[in-house]
């Protein structure tokens, strides 16, 4: 069952990444890859914490979403290739900006994802009834 969930969610994540490339692709800067990786950092931190704590989501579904959808949506390999291509084309400023935005931005997005999940989880604890 795990393979089915990971496969289905992986297909959806790959299609969403492809759509982002169509929407944001082109130009000298790999903005589509940066966007999917930053969004993926936020989603993984938020969804895995929130779904694991709040709802009765099965481990199979969590793996499908985390490993399948977010794993296929994000791409470290494209980040690496994009960085090397920027360096080889002499676009050092773009390359350094891309690496810094990816790593620092990724950490910030994880922090925001966890903060939002914590806020929503704590809000539910304060309700009466």
Swiss-Prot record:
Bilayer disposition of the protein: Multi-pass membrane protein
Activity regulation text: Na(+) is not transported, but it plays an essential structural role and its presence is essential for fluoride channel function.
UniProt key word Cytoplasm: no
One annotated GO biological process: fluoride transmembrane transport
GO CC annotation terms, alphabetical: plasma membrane
Keywords carried by this UniProt record: Cell membrane, Ion channel, Ion transport, Membrane, Metal-binding, Sodium, Transmembrane, Transmembrane helix, Transport
Residues reported in the UniProt entry to bind Na(+): 71, 74
Major site of localization recorded for this protein: membrane
Alphabetical list of InterPro entries matching this protein: FluC
Disulphide linkage map: none
A GO term for molecular function: metal ion binding
Family of this protein: Belongs to the fluoride channel Fluc/FEX (TC 1.A.43) family.
General function of this protein: Fluoride-specific ion channel. Important for reducing fluoride concentration in the cell, thus reducing its toxicity.
Name by which UniProt lists this protein: Fluoride-specific ion channel FluC 2
Natural source organism: Listeria monocytogenes serovar 1/2a (strain ATCC BAA-679 / EGD-e)
């Amino acid at each position: 069952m795990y393979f089915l969930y990971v496969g289905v969610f992986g297909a959806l994540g790959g299609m969403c990444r492809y759509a982002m490339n169509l929407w944001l692709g082109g130009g000298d800067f790999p903005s589509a890859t940066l966007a999917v990786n930053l969004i993926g950092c936020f989603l993984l931190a938020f969804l895995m914490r929130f779904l694991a704590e709040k709802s009765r989501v099965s481990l199979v579904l969590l793996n499908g979403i985390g490993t399948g959808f977010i794993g296929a949506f994000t791409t470290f390999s494209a980040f690496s290739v994009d960085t090397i291509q920027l360096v080889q084309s002499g676009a050092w400023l773009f390359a350094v900006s891309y690496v810094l935005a990816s790593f620092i931005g990724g950490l910030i997005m994880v922090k925001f994802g966890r903060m939002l999940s914590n806020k929503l989880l704590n809000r539910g604890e304060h309700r009466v009834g």
